[in-house]
Amino acid sequence: MNDNIIEQGVAAAAESSLDHSILNAAHIAADDAAIVADAASIISDSESLETEAEQAEVEQKPNGFVELGLAPELVQAVADLGYTQPTAVQAKAIPLAMNKGPNATAFVDLMVSSQTGSGKTAAFLLPVLHTLLEQQAEIEAEGRAEFERACAEAAANGEPAPKRKRKDPTNPRNFKAAAPGALILCPTRELAQQVAHDAIELVKHCRGLRVANVVGGIPYQLQIAKLQNANLVVATPGRLLDLQRSMQIKLDKVQFLVVDEADRMLDLGFSDDLAEVNQMTSQRQQTMMFSATFASRIQQLAMRVMHDNGAGVKKIQIDSPQEKHSSIKQVLFWADNAQHKRKL
């Protein structure tokens, strides 16, 4: 009898102890959840305030691309993409590339060291497209002036006014090899396609400015058709030289040469191709080279392709800032004992 009472007492004590353990564990779990919720709330509020402050600061600033002196068509295209302020590399490279310095008398060669994601593509596309727009406007103005002179002469002689001649580009008789004013070389097909896509986005408000992409893996006839009247060509070296050797493209009118990711270009063995393109575009006014670093081999390449062996080249080096990823959710878990660590 007494033994039964003792056993029942022990069982009751054990059950009571177990109940307290469960309650304590529940309280601990609830406390952990509250701590995590508070931490997440603090992080979320902090990120929200930071984002709102950044947006307010951007809204107060005038459009930075306007201040860089870019053509209105390009500024509008950039705004359509959601950008009103240039990145560090854009703010430094664009004025130099556009020959906008206070004492600038000619285009200067540029070497730019900037990491992927810094906005480097727009840093060379925007000034090149801006200059092509200016040149196109000059050509169109000369054409209008010549037509007006012809009309005046016809009127003076009592003859009917001449008609503007428009060639049908689809007619094989009107075919002529492409002669772009600007050439951008990329080490890989994927990069060339991305750069060409970005260029097309930027020229959507630019009447008459055409972009062509020349890469391997695309049928020749399709690329040849797209090359017609192209002002800017984005290419990989191999396919570009193939089309040049078959007389589908001429490089003697190239005024601006950009070598993107020059370090990868050398890694992939395009040194000889670069030398060949360099020789074919010797008449160009400007060369820009973009690379992740200014390693010695990049310096040597610059000496081979820049004017005056790189003596007058301007160098821009942008340090990579600490990245912010606002889309990543941060959660804090306190792990002060074995039970909590098992939850992780």
Q: Where do the protein language model's features map onto the residues?
A:
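Residue-level signature of catalytic and energy-coupling elements of molecular machines
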Residues: V78, Q90, V112, V128, ...
